[in-house]
């Protein structure tokens, strides 16, 4: 089964680095706690075209379960409904771990 990447975007002005760090560190404990619900990683986004996050989930099912329950909360907190883009990811390359995976299983890649 593939992992699922969800890109969440809010059409809001770019925040200062200080605001972005404060926002990320204040909500990071919530996302750390979602490991039990299938969240593998979250990256906070901040740029000229808006703010948001990139979420890597263990499955689309896990991602849909969480976002379905939380989309209204996110819209209320930011004052605008986010745009969500969904992707299946079959082959992640992780240079921090030095591995390539296919559907969750490490494979040996020969150059």
Listing of model-derived features with the role each one plays in the protein:
Residues 1-50, 60-68, 83-111:
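Short S/T/G/P-rich N-terminal loop/turn motif that feeds into the first structured element of a domain
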């Amino acid at each position: 089964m593939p992992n699922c990447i969800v890109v969440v975007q809010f059409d809001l002005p770019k925040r200062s680095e200080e605001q972005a760090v404060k926002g990320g560190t204040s909500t990071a404990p919530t996302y750390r706690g979602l490991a039990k619900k299938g969240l593998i990683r979250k990256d906070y986004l901040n740029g000229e075209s808006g703010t948001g996050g990139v979420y890597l989930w263990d499955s689309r099912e896990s991602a849909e379960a969480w976002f379905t329950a939380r989309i209204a909360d996110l819209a209320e907190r930011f004052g605008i409904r986010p745009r969500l883009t969904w992707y299946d990811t079959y082959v992640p390359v992780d240079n921090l771990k030095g591995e390539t995976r296919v559907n969750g299983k490490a494979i040996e890649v020969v150059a």
